[in-house]
């Protein structure tokens, strides 16, 4: 009975709440958590969180030791709830802040990707990308704050709520009554239909919202100066370089001093500059002159508002925008084409290039029946008729001239594998009609061209066919429009060539001798007749003189 008493005491000493048992961590879990915390603290520069972690883990270790000893459990059970609350809340905070990481540059505790700076410090993804791209630390809000602003930043919850309400009212007043004309010409004040997506207007709204942490009395002090026009504000900003309102520094361009821009850029020294100055420096390699500064920002009309046709401002600035929108009217596009041609007419060099670019293409050739006819024919250079006659092509070639040409104009219809050129075909047809005495190797030369022995018209006919257009047989293989064009050109010729005599075969040597004898006899007879006529004239003169 006495032996069972300690067992009953140990059973009574167990907690009746099962949730409390589940919340107690084992020694292995505590060691793993301690290793994670120590590894996370290795890259941190701040030592305050390390002391807080030691204070947090000390009650947990003390609770683990006392839970293993059953004698002090009732007292520990009464003091456990406060320790559990203090131990579980930092753990949840550690999980949400990714094991206690914080950016050494901006101080944030949440980021999609943690990075390391060149010095080994832990930085967030935004600061890491900025440092990698510009080799300069990313400017943060705490870097822009003045040293005296830390004391002014410690306000009560009531003061913060009043400043936020004042900043919201200031933003609404700016967005409600703006003087922006719209249509691509923006001054950042809002009030037009397309200002909701304007980067300059959104930038101004963001800047006014960022100054919401200023106390309410500072708004009363600077409220009179905020009603001035935009041009005066930008001029003051250009003179001073930066406008300080209640401890916050308003970003302004280092070059021209403007505070309204669609995109803030940085120069080679890391100073903020506006989009216009940044693009000018990127293109020209020098700073943008301050005389080029304008009070109105002209932006691209990428998104056309739905009520653009009904607004007078959209109709006013639609024609002189910086870029044409896809929904531009045909009249605007026609006007741009007229300007383009007018510009081309002013410069003769560009006009010549433009006309050369839009030159008329040559007429197409119909190759539909090329394989059927076996010859290539163009409208301007038709083949000679001797190449199209099969009896000419089938004649055997006995030309002693070596055949050097390999390119062919018309393939042979006799079915031979070798293709002949124009020179080969002409030489073969000419040598085919030479007498057999020359072929046998005689020493006689071919006859001299004379009136009695005209030249063979074979080559002349081929040249004439090249100069003249082809007949109806060749035109039947071409496109009807091309055939009509060739007939029209043939009709407009001023002096047609005289018709050539039909081709005749060359006479032989014996025939030439007979022709010479006949010619000699004919000339002798004509001479005798002329002598007889001369004697008759002399007799008449003698009779008249007697």
From Swiss-Prot:
List where this protein forms a coiled coil. Answer: 508-546
Q: What happens when the gene is disrupted?
A: During iron-replete conditions, partially derepresses synthesis of triacetylfusarinine C (TAFC) and uptake of iron resulting in increased cellular accumulation of both iron and ferricrocin (FC). Increases sensitivity to iron and oxidative stress.
- Biased-composition ranges, Polar residues, are 65-91, 162-172, 423-453
Localisation:
Nucleus
Q: Where is the composition biased (Low complexity)?
A: 318-331
Describe the task this protein carries out: GATA-type transcription repressor that regulates iron- acquisition genes through specific binding the GATA sequence element 5'-ATCWGATAA-3' of target promoters. Iron acquisition regulation is critical for survival under both iron-limiting conditions (to acquire essential iron) and iron-replete conditions (to limit iron toxicity). SreA targets include genes encoding a number of key iron-regulated factors such as those involved in siderophore biosynthesis.
Q: What is this protein called?
A: GATA-type transcription factor sreA
Q: What is the lineage of its organism?
A: Eukaryota, Fungi, Dikarya, Ascomycota, Pezizomycotina
């Amino acid at each position: 009975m006495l032996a069972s008493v300690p067992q009953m005491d140990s059973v009574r000493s167990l907690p009746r709440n099962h949730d409390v048992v589940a919340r107690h961590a084992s020694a292995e879990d505590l060691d793993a958590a301690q290793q994670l915390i120590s590894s996370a603290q290795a890259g941190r520069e701040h030592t305050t969180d390390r002391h807080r972690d030691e204070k947090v883990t000390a009650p947990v270790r003390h609770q683990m030791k006392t839970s293993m000893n059953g004698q002090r459990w009732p007292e520990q059970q009464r003091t456990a709830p406060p320790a559990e609350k203090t131990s579980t809340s930092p753990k949840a905070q550690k999980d949400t802040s990714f094991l206690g990481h914080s950016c050494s540059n901006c101080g944030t505790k949440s980021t999609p990707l943690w990075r390391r700076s060149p010095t080994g410090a832990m930085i967030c993804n935004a600061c890491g990308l900025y440092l990698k791209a510009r080799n300069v630390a990313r400017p943060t809000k705490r870097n822009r704050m003045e040293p005296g602003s830390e004391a002014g930043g410690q306000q009560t919850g009531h003061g913060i709520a009043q400043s936020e309400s004042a900043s919201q009212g200031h933003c609404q007043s700016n967005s409600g009554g703006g003087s922006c004309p719209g249509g691509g010409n923006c001054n950042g004040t809002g009030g037009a239909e397309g200002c909701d997506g304007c980067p300059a207007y959104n930038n101004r709204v963001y800047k006014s919202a960022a100054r919401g942490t200023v106390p309410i009395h500072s708004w009363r002090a600077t409220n009179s100066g905020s009603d001035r026009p935009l041009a005066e504000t930008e001029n003051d900003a250009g003179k001073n370089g930066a406008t300080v309102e209640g401890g916050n520094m308003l970003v302004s361009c280092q070059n021209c001093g403007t505070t309204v821009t669609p995109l803030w850029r940085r120069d080679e020294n890391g100073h903020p500059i506006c989009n216009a100055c940044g693009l000018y420096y990127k293109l020209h390699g020098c700073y943008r002159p301050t005389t080029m500064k304008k009070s109105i920002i002209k932006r691209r009309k990428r998104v056309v508002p739905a009520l653009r046709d009904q607004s007078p401002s959209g109709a006013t600035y639609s024609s002189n925008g910086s870029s044409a929108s896809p929904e531009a009217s045909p009249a605007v596009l026609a006007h741009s084409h007229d300007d383009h041609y007018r510009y081309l007419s002013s410069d003769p060099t560009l006009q010549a290039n433009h006309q050369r670019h839009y030159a008329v293409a040559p007429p197409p050739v119909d190759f539909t029946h090329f394989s059927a006819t076996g010859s290539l024919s163009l409208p301007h250079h038709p083949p000679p008729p001797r190449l199209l006659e099969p009896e000419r092509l089938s004649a055997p070639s006995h030309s002693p001239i070596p055949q050097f040409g390999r390119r062919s104009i018309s393939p042979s219809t006799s079915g031979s594998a070798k293709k002949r050129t124009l020179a080969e075909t002409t030489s073969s047809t000419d040598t085919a009609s030479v007498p057999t005495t020359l072929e046998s190797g005689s020493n006689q030369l071919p006859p001299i061209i004379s009136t009695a022995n005209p030249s063979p018209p074979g080559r002349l006919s081929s040249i004439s066919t090249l100069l003249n257009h082809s007949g109806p047989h060749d035109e039947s293989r071409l496109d009807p429009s091309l055939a009509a064009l060739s007939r029209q050109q043939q009709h407009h010729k001023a002096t047609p060539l005289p018709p050539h005599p039909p081709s005749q075969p060359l006479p032989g040597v014996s025939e030439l001798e007979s022709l010479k004898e006949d010619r000699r006899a004919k000339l002798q007879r004509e001479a005798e007749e002329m002598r007889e006529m001369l004697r008759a004239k002399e007799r008449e003169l003698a009779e008249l003189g007697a």
